[in-house]
């Protein structure tokens, strides 16, 4: 009986994500990655001249400043980029 209870506890811990992990889209939005610890923002980078076509997506710790040529959009919810 103790073995069964211990097994259920272990399976529950393995199946549940006990710590919150952010998921961000990769360049192709069908695919995503789980962000490592400390990277708590998703970002999308694109050229100002072609704002509809993202150049890069992923996880980041601090949102970079946009420039005249490159724009960054950052967010902090799952797959928001």
Swiss-Prot record:
It comes from the Eukaryota. The keyword ATP-binding does not apply. Keywords: Cardiotoxin, Cytolysis, Disulfide bond, Hemolysis, Membrane, Secreted, Signal, Target cell membrane, Target membrane, Toxin. Belongs to the three-finger toxin family. Short-chain subfamily. Type IA cytotoxin sub-subfamily. Monomer in solution; Homodimer and oligomer in the presence of negatively charged lipids forming a pore with a size ranging between 20 and 30 Angstroms. Interacts with Kv channel-interacting protein 1 (KCNIP1) in a calcium-independent manner. Basic protein that binds to cell membrane and depolarizes cardiomyocytes. This cytotoxin also possesses lytic activity on many other cells, including red blood cells. Interaction with sulfatides in the cell membrane induces pore formation and cell internalization. Cytotoxicity is due to pore formation, and to another mechanism independent of membrane-damaging activity. When internalized, it targets the mitochondrial membrane and induces mitochondrial swelling and fragmentation. It inhibits protein kinases C. It binds to the integrin alpha-V/beta-3 (ITGAV/ITGB3) with a moderate affinity. This is Cytotoxin 3.
